[in-house]
């Protein structure tokens, strides 16, 4: 039969046999679920009762991409460079505005920010590729004339401070970039080297680091932010050390709270949320410690760095007005920030999960 039902004859007349799993098999307006039914006859379908327009969970997945060619120069200072991936601006090329207007993945992010209620930060990816290594050395037989040699066999070091907490300053836009700061410790190979886990990256190879961001609970979302705009350089990636206040250089609290005015009513929303701590150790790019006649060999690495930031934008529902937006904004939380003066980013290598 063309219908969803079948006809059988058992000698006592005709009976109708129905399917057993809801839909037309359970009759009009009935079924195994609690959803309301809509439609007619055997083609009846389920409908979520409190979301008639099915727009309350509309999301758009987007990846913000950047690619930079970097010059890690250790001629004058052999200390490791700090990769400040804990800053939100690192992922949006905030530190390098060159041709940023032509980066369509950033432009799409800005457009989605304008129509999104909140954002879920999923994960970030950082890929390094070494395409050239040179070494500065003294010319043979001289004491003050230098030259450059290609070092095709020399690897670059990537290191994590995953043994104890570290930090770095965040007082300028430039500090969100990978070439702005070097450590104050002497090297990765000194008496304190046990603080770092080191990896070697050969030339013509790629190394990708994946960072899983702090996930919010209870339907909370992060508030949309233009991570390419220079005035937002104090904002950090989702982390559970709490909101960093103006009154102290570094305030760490188990609770994140804020007071923000929304909508024309002037009503104030207050949000409090408990989250588990998340590990974001400080990351470094370094050269090896190899003695020579000038102290230590001085290398220079040309590196291609690519980043991918995976975001999920939660769109405003249809027929959103000031009254209900104020209610929904109670589910959005500002990204953590450092203080306006003497801002410090804490790089915690510990993860404590109490679940």
Curated annotation (Swiss-Prot):
Residues 1-21 have a biased composition (Basic and acidic residues). It is found in: Virion. The keyword Transcription regulation does not apply. GO terms for biological process: clathrin-dependent endocytosis of virus by host cell; symbiont entry into host cell via permeabilization of host membrane; virion attachment to host cell. Disulfide bonds: none annotated. Keywords: Capsid protein, Clathrin-mediated endocytosis of virus by host, Host-virus interaction, T=1 icosahedral capsid protein, Viral attachment to host cell, Viral penetration into host cytoplasm, Viral penetration via permeabilization of host membrane, Virion, Virus endocytosis by host, Virus entry into host cell. GO terms for cellular component: T=1 icosahedral viral capsid. Capsid protein self-assembles to form an icosahedral capsid with a T=1 symmetry, about 22 nm in diameter, and consisting of 60 copies of size variants of the capsid proteins, which differ in the N-terminushe capsid encapsulates the genomic ssDNA. Capsid proteins are responsible for the attachment to host cell receptors. This attachment induces virion internalization predominantly through clathrin-dependent endocytosis. Belongs to the parvoviridae capsid protein family. This is Capsid protein VP1/VP2. The lineage of its organism: Viruses, Monodnaviria, Shotokuvirae, Cossaviricota, Quintoviricetes.
């Amino acid at each position: 039969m063309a219908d969803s039902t079948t006809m059988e004859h058992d000698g006592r007349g005709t009976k109708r046999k129905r399917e057993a799993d809801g839909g037309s098999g359970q009759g009009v307006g009935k079924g195994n679920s609690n959803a309301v039914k809509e439609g007619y006859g055997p083609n009846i379908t389920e409908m979520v009762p409190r979301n008639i327009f099915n727009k309350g969970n509309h999301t758009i997945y987007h990846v913000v991409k950047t690619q930079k060619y970097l010059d890690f120069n250790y001629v004058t200072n052999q200390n490791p460079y700090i990769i400040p991936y804990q800053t939100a601006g690192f992922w949006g090329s905030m530190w390098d505005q060159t041709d940023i207007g032509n980066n369509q993945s950033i432009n799409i992010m800005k457009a989605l920010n304008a129509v999104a209620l909140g954002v879920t930060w999923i994960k970030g990816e950082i890929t390094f590729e070494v395409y050239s290594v040179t070494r500065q050395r003294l010319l043979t037989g001289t004491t003050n004339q230098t030259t450059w040699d290609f070092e095709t066999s020399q690897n670059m070091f990537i290191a994590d401070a995953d043994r104890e907490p570290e930090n770095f300053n965040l007082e300028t836009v430039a500090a969100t970039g990978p070439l702005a700061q070097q450590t104050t410790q002497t090297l990765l190979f000194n008496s304190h080297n046990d603080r770092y886990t080191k990896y070697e990256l050969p030339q013509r190879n790629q190394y990708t680091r994946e960072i899983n961001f702090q996930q919010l609970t209870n339907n909370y979302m992060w508030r949309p932010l233009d991570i390419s705009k220079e005035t937002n350089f104090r904002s950090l990636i989702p982390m559970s050390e709490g909101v960093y206040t103006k009154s102290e250089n570094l305030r760490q609290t188990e609770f994140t709270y804020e007071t923000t005015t929304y909508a024309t009513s002037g009503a104030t929303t207050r949000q409090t949320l408990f989250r588990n701590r998340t590990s974001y150790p400080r990351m470094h790019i370094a050269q090896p410690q190899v003695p020579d006649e000038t102290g230590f060999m001085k290398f220079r690495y040309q590196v291609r760095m690519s980043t991918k930031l995976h975001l999920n934008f939660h769109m405003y529902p249809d027929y959103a007005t000031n009254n209900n937006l104020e209610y929904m904004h109670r589910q959005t939380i500002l990204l953590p920030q450092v203080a306006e003066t003497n801002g410090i980013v804490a790089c915690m290598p510990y993860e404590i999960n109490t679940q």
